[in-house]
Amino acid sequence: MNRFALVLLGLSSLALADPTSPEVEAVLKRDFHARGQATLDRIPQDGLQRLCTESGNHPPAAIAKALEGDQLRSIPYPEGSLIGDWKRGEKIAQGGRGLTWSDKPGAANDGSCYNCHQLSPAEMSYGTVGPSLRGIGKTRGNGPDAQRYVYGKIYNAKAFNLCSQMPRLGASGTLTPEQIKDLVALLLDPASPVNR
């Protein structure tokens, strides 16, 4: 953690905007209110997010590589197969439930993957913030290396791209290891709609 603090200190001169400026604080206080499980603790950036903000999503390459390595080493890969059930994975990917004020606390969350990615050819509407994942199992295969990569990317995308916009679905506790394995199956199983 000390190395991380030194990195942030060293990059403070790269700040493009002060995310805690009085104007931003005023907007946050005016527009965001805690309600149910949707609390205000989600708003402050953690150290990695702040580093990316302050560097315009382009921190020095050596620093990004070192921090990505730290993030990669923090991923707790489960024992055995990383492939779950693609049918459950499809429900998780297409569902938009979880961590909002109207959701029941403690209920299983969904991944909302469709908000950022195209998953299957049949989808009529999908987000384009992230890359299309259509046919990913065909292009990457579904062996142990592909499974490990996809599991890790879903668990903590910042291990592969420090300034990724993809949420850290496992590291944040949003999804369980079993749910992530189901998403791995959706993306890599040849029988899933993603790869048909």
Model feature map: region roles:
Residues 1-4:
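Positively charged n-region of N-terminal signal peptides that target proteins for export
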Residues 6, 77-78, 102, 169-172:
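Generic anion/oxyanion-binding catalytic loop in active/binding sites
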Residues 9-17:
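Hydrophobic h-region of N-terminal signal peptides that target proteins for export
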Residues 16-99, 153, 186-196:
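Post-cleavage N-terminal segment of exported redox proteins
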Residues 23, 28, 33-39, 83-88, ...:
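Extracytoplasmic electron-transfer domains, predominantly the class I c-type cytochrome c fold
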Residues 99-102, 122-126, 193:
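Secretory-pathway/luminal and periplasmic proteins that interact with or process carbohydrate-rich
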Residues 101-112:
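Local sequence-structure signature of Cys/Sec-based thiol-disulfide redox active-site neighborhoods
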